[in-house]
Amino acid sequence: MTIPFHKEIRIGGYLLKQKLLGRKRFPLVLMLEPLFRCNLACAGCGKIDYPDAILNRRMTVQECLDAADECGAPMVAIPGGEPLIHREIGEIVAGLVARKKFVSLCTNALLLEKKLHLFKPSPYLFFSVHLDGLREHHDKAVS
């Protein structure tokens, strides 16, 4: 998979700016987890072992956008849990895209067809679908 030219330019510009400012350490990707809850219980994922108080917590749209603003990274990965479970995931993504953040929404895709209407096509948004190998191995790993 190639990287779109506009993304190369934006990220390259960000890296150059950090270098010119003399910064040796700076964020490149914000790992934003608006929730830990998932619609699967994969054996390899430690999230299922968290107490319900954590699994039931949801970041608000404003908390997510504030975190992105504070971090300043040009890229935001939204893993989970399963982000498509979040009731406001469409607004979270729209707010990040409006800030010209490159958003990678990581999903197991079980809800993707049902939730796809929440997302407006954008060169700043892509979906990363999690698979654990070919069908037989994947189905065993996530069941």
Task: Tell me what each language-model feature is.
Residues P83-I85, A109-K114, V129-S143:
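Conserved radical SAM core fold
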Residues F126:
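Broad gene-expression machinery/nucleic-acid interaction feature
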